Amino acid sequence: MRITNTLTGKKEEFVPIQPGVVRMYVCGPTVYDLIHVGNARPAVVFDVFRRYLEYRGYRVIMVQNFTDIDDKIINKANQLGVDYKTVADTFIAEYWRDAHALGIRPANFHPRTTDFVDDIVEIIERLVEKGVAYQTETGVYFDVRKFEKYGELSKKKIEDLIAGARVEVDETKKFPLDFSLWKKAKPGEPCWKSPWGEGRPGWHIECTVMSVKILGESFDIHAGGEDLVFPHHENEKAQAEALTGKVFARYWMHNGMVRFLGDKMSKSTGNIFTVREAVKRYGRDGLRYMILSKHYRSPMDFSEELLQDYSRAVKRVWEILGRYEKSGDIGIPKRNAVYEEYVNRFVEALDDDFNTPVAVSLIFELARNLSKAMDDNDREDALLYYHLIRREFGPVLGLFDLNEEKKEVSSEELLKLLIEVRDVLRKEKRYDLSDRIRDHLREIGIILKDTPSGTEYTVE
């Protein structure tokens, strides 16, 4: 398997640190509004990448965070006249509703920034002790000139970054590119205690701390949109490597941006099309097909007309599948030479820098073959093509997936709620009730594992 590593700019063979296990961190949303198609792209891309790694036999430990304290969240709370927690909790719940509708499987861990403030303070203290961070009257900053490899990920020199980048304007900083680790609280803002006074974490330190605490000081893959390469991922890398002296993430994967009406789709400009509206009008598979039909590193143009075209193409495949399912002949085909050839083509495509356009095209080729086999009354070939779509490739791509249909009986939001309720019960030492929740979930195939970083679960 070869993937393009942003760090080196090259397509490299993927070799995990621990054989058979992949640890990956995907930057998640700042929760102050509904997610849009631009947010959906990394969610779908890395959902499928995780599925494919599992298909290839890897055990994947995936983390996707929620930034639940941020200027945008505070501003939204002020607009609505509510507490910042209300905004964060509301839009995390809305995220799960949209993610479930889009067929996004939950990561193993979904940490919130506010659950890691003590860890963040501890890490900042260590950075200050190492001399790579300093305190000012407005907070604590990372001194980028103390980290020799700053700019390595974005492939830019410090002087070029100063000229072209968006940086925090603060006259108390030693250097324009120095970035905030801890922001001193303004009147009325939510805040936490620290050695530098009451305040809250900076954006970049959040992801560094959550990834290191859950996945370890070095892990395999760090992923997100290409707009995060600088400053967010560059700063994450600088903090982590200055702290530990180790390589932070071995492979960096970044998806291209979604363009809508000629510009990048963005909440800040109001140039958006929500996932909820897209799925409501054109269906889950239509949107997933649209996203996967473009190579993940390429920019993606979005329009409602294009989405409608993808939705129509998906509908035709569903009609072919429905026609076959009426025959009732849904068994297990023989893995003959034709079957193996398709599997090899599928693996070859996704092993080559995760080429989903080729992988998705195989499903449509199989659908055409299935239709012809039914016309020719070739039951053996028809079963083979049907099985490849519904049980072999569909579950990997999250398209036409028979397994997903069965799972929709259980609600992801309900599972998350049960886990949160159980955590509260455990903190209150009401172990009789918390154990009952754990045992009942085990009976339906959901296995809980309590770790220092939170509750992890797997579905058997």
Swiss-Prot record:
Motif 'KMSKS' region per record, residues: 264-268
Cofactor: Zn(2+)
Residue positions binding ATP: K267
EC number(s) from the headed UniProt entry: 6.1.1.16
Record-linked SUPFAM superfamilies: Anticodon-binding domain of a subclass of class I aminoacyl-tRNA synthetases, Nucleotidylyl transferase
Keyword GTP-binding attached: no
Binding site for Zn(2+): C27, C207, H232, E236
Keywords assigned: Aminoacyl-tRNA synthetase, ATP-binding, Cytoplasm, Ligase, Metal-binding, Nucleotide-binding, Protein biosynthesis, Zinc
Note on cofactor: Binds 1 zinc ion per subunit.
Single annotated GO MF: cysteine-tRNA ligase activity
Location of the protein in the cell: Cytoplasm
Family as reported in the entry's similarity comment: Belongs to the class-I aminoacyl-tRNA synthetase family.
Quaternary structure and partners: Monomer.
UniProt name for this protein: Cysteine--tRNA ligase
Gene, per the UniProt record: cysS
